[in-house]
Amino acid sequence: KSPKSWGLNTIANSPDKDIFMRRKTPYVERFEIKGPALSGKAAWWPFRDPFDPAFRKNVADNLKSRSGMTDDPWCIGFFVDNEIHWGDKFDLARFTIMSPASLAGKIRFKGELEKKYGGISGLNGAWGTKFADWDAFLQNREVPKGADKKDLEDFTSLMAEEYFKVIREEFDKFAPNKLYLGCRFAGSNENVVRIGAKYCDAVSYNRYADNLKKLKLPAGIDKPVMIGEWHFGALDRGPFHPSLIKRENQADRADSYYEYAKSALENPNVVGIHWHQFSDQAATGRFDGENFQVGLTDVCDTPYAETIAKIREIGRDLYRIRQAAPLP
């Protein structure tokens, strides 16, 4: 009952199923794709190879296993994956080169290069390499210093395109009435955002910042934006870590909540912001030691009155602020 009385209108990512299946509040859900992954740097989750048949099957299986949600009018839609490391406009190709020869994506990369260069001598001339044959290209796991930037950029774009396209196609088959809410960018590049916007119903970001005044989609892209995570924390009460965005005390934290939410309402593309998280984390830490003071309630389920007051205040001001926002 508390969230509704505070003015909150959805249950955010990764909720307790026993709560959202009471069907009293609209909710979203998330799943992560499993399967063969690219080598190279990863964030929370590695980048799964969208050219491997297991990728498509895993997306389909995840959606089919959620048939109670895909048919539920209270379910808004699904995020897929979380905080993938996209890197720059060349990195997915670099990660592919660093991967084993058996990776489906690497075999596809070889095929694209064969179409462009024909024999291996053409690639060697362009990249400054000395591969004996195309199998040697597959076996190699070091990114050549002279690798053609256009080739890397083109394949990175192709892999991103395949990633979003396959997910979109499986949504259309198994969850046609639900929104594909994107992958919760926590770092990306403009090209990937452009590609994702073609297939996602909303572009999602985990955006830890003072506000959203600097959040802009690439030029020419007009798409709804969802904020999957944001928060502020302070050390005057609660656990012993002030969170990713520190504030001096609970009053300062509450004011920051209002200002962030206000900046979202002033951005005509932003359609929702999901606070991370409902309760403080345990003082002893979660699996990775994280013990942030980020809750709307403490670990004993006592609300932080200062923040709750500001949540209610922005709820009262919501339509006035939104109606004054510029058109996209």
Walk through the language-model features, giving the residues of each.
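The substrate-binding groove and active-site-proximal loops of carbohydrate-active enzymes
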Residues: K1-S2, W6-N9, S39-D61, L113, ...
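Aromatic-lined substrate-binding rim segments of carbohydrate-active enzymes
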Residues: K1-T70, F164-A175, V192, A197-K198, ...
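Conserved, mostly hydrophobic/aromatic
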Residues: P3, I11, F78, G119, ...
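Substrate-binding cleft of secreted/luminal carbohydrate-active enzymes
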Residues: A12, P73-G77, D81-E83, W230, ...
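Aromatic-rich peripheral "rim/lid" segments of glycoside hydrolase catalytic domains that contact
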Residues: A93-R108, H276-P328
